[in-house]
């Protein structure tokens, strides 16, 4: 790559970086350049090496797409980030584009670029599905898409290096299925799809299959790798210097060979037979050495189950978990999309392998937890609940003494409380701690440059979680500071009613998660209130806190592979946000279990949500006059469960706090 003429040392502001990108575009013949929020594994959360959108634009939200032309620049984000993006983009020359209010970036490019224009994007930041959708939208307008190189390499001189952290074995005490057993299940599913080989690039799937864990992505115990599974062998493409002897031995015993991370595209190009790929979770760069005739598969129409052109980002955002929704938007039954098979390529190459597109089988296998996984997770939830009792008792005591805390200190205190629990590894995501108006930003993140002190009257929202060797937690609670207003209690009670409505729902096994969303929102809709994010996402087992395939969001498509199944762990997290005033969200994790004593058996299996999260919901913010007797009874039952499970684990001030916060509501 030819370096930009702009000295890298001068690129200290988004405006300067934007100018450098435009200069590189001009040098290399691009009329527009796209910087998505992605990496070669289509991860929701990525190593810093691929945070190019953040580096150029200054917008630090986890999801967004930067598009730059010679005269315009914009970042497309969903409603969760509108306020944050407006503040961070001010003065940069980059405009906020509100998804849902404006045309998509794909439509903008198709509508405004002239015939013969060239749009560029780094091939390792573009999924096969996104590449196809862009091509389908741009080609009719005579606009060419090139995904060949990364222009940022030419002027991002201090780009963070690739991660090199150790890769370790997930302790056997917490593993319910061996890698060999998991591979056998995957191979059987691959064979059912008519494929001989399967390429997996999604990091959580690879970690789950290999029973290995890493720390390449902050908060997510995954590591950079690709996994190629054949009928009788498998190869892990990874920097093998990071594997200790135990990890190497575990892979050998499962029949998994090692190869350099960078060689995956060559290995794919050398395959014969048929290759199953998930088009939403494999990068264009991984397949770019295949002949054109092979890559033409599915280009006549979007793969089954994929989103409309330009809708991928919005679909992910609507699911309140980019990666979770991406998994839920894949081509579940797309083996029939592999229409063009072994035709010779125009270059004279022979197409040696046929592409078959479908969701990774491991995505569903991973999403359905075993009985042992659920038991381990219950223990992790109890540990987490005990830590939260200690934290909240300490927090309230500090406030009563007149100590002034800030949002950053809350994060430190809650992480320290979790760290005292057995098997704790790290937080499961960056803590969202927002006081009053800050909580109105669903993905607010306090920074050393911008945070609020907890003083005066109001409400404090804390959305946090932990990674334990025996499970992953995610919980949101809102607590009063000083005296809450009647309006705050009303809003909190509406959110609570929504939470209870879904928590008490019985539903058919196999129903689409998006169909459940209206049940949760109904109590709020009746008062003309709503929230802009999804209601629920899947959660991993000592893996990503956002996991597919299931999602509870009416914005997401209803797809067969993402149906609600027994053993899935999902969040229930309705919210209500008043910009400039306050924000409320109440979140528990639940597991799908079959109804124990069904009244009927003629209509199939029915499931219910069994609570996993153990922490009081603050009754000081509840207006019982707005609640039914059934809702009051639910709160009392839940608090009795919390008290029963946590009382033996806490003592002193934490136990006193638990007792006080789980006192039954009258009625």
Set out the residue ranges of the language-model regions.
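Active-site neighborhoods and metal-handling regions in enzymes and metal-associated proteins
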Residues: 1-667
């Amino acid at each position: 790559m030819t370096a930009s003429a702009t000295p890298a040392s001068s690129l200290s502001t988004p405006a300067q970086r934007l100018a450098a990108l435009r200069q590189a575009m001009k040098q290399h013949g691009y009329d527009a350049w796209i910087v998505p929020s992605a990496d070669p594994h289509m991860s929701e959360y990525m190593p810093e090496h691929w945070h190019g959108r953040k580096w150029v634009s200054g917008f630090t939200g986890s999801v967004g797409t930067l598009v730059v032309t010679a005269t315009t620049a914009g970042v497309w984000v969903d409603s969760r980030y509108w306020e944050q993006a407006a503040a961070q983009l001010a003065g940069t020359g980059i405009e906020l584009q509100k998804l849902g209010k404006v045309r998509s970036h794909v439509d903008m490019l198709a509508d405004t670029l002239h015939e013969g224009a060239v749009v560029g994007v780094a091939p390792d930041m573009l999924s096969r599905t996104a590449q196809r959708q862009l091509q389908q939208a741009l080609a009719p307008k005579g606009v060419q898409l090139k995904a060949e190189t990364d222009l940022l390499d030419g002027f991002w001189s201090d780009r963070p290096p690739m991660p090199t952290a150790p890769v370790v074995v997930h302790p056997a005490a917490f593993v319910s299925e061996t890698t060999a057993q998991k591979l056998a299940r995957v191979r059987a599913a691959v064979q059912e799809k008519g494929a001989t080989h399967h390429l997996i690039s999604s990091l959580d799937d690879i970690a789950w299959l290999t029973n290995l864990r890493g720390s390449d992505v902050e908060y997510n115990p995954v590591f950079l790798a690709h996994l190629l599974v054949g009928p009788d062998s498998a190869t892990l493409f990874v920097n093998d210097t990071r594997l200790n002897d135990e990890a190497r031995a575990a892979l050998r015993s499962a029949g998994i060979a090692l190869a350099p991370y960078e060689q995956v595209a060559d290995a794919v190009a050398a395959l014969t037979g048929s290759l199953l790929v998930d088009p939403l979770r494999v990068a264009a760069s991984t397949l770019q050495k295949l002949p054109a005739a092979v890559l033409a598969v599915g280009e006549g129409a979007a793969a089954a189950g994929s989103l409309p052109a330009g809708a991928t980002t919005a679909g992910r955002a609507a699911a309140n978990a980019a990666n979770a929704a991406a998994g839920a938007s894949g081509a579940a039954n797309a083996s029939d999309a592999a229409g063009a098979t072994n035709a010779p390529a125009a270059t004279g190459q022979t197409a040696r392998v046929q592409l078959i597109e479908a969701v990774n089988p491991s995505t569903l296998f991973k999403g359905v937890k075993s009985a042992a996984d659920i038991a381990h997770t219950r223990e992790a939830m109890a540990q987490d609940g005990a830590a939260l009792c200690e934290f909240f008792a300490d927090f309230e005591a500090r406030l009563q003494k007149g100590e002034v805390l800030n949002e950053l200190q809350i994060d430190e205190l809650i992480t320290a409380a979790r760290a005292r629990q057995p098997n704790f590894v790290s937080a499961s995501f960056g803590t969202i701690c927002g006081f009053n108006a800050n909580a109105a930003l669903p993905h607010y993140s306090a920074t050393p440059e911008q945070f609020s002190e907890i003083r005066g009257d109001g409400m404090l929202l804390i959305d946090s979680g932990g990674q334990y060797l025996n499970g992953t937690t995610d919980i949101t609670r809102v607590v009063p500071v000083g005296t809450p207003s009647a309006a705050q209690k009303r809003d909190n009670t509406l959110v609570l009613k929504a939470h209870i409505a879904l928590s008490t729902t019985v539903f058919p096994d196999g129903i689409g998660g998006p169909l459940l969303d209206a049940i949760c929102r109904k109590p709020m809709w009746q008062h003309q209130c709503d929230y802009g994010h999804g209601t629920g996402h899947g959660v991993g087992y000592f893996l990503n806190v956002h996991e597919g395939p299931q999602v509870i969001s009416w914005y997401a498509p209803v797809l067969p592979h993402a149906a609600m199944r027994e053993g899935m762990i999902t969040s229930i997290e309705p919210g209500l946000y008043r910009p400039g005033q306050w924000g409320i969200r109440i979140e528990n994790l639940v597991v799908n279990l079959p109804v124990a004593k069904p009244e009927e058996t003629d209509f199939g299996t029915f499931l219910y949500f069994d609570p996993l999260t153990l922490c009081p919901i603050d009754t000081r913010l509840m207006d019982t006059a707005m609640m039914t007797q059934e809702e009051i009874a639910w709160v009392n039952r839940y608090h009795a469960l919390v008290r029963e499970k946590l009382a033996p684990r806490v003592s002193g001030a934490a136990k006193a706090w638990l007792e006080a916060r789980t006192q039954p509501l009258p009625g």
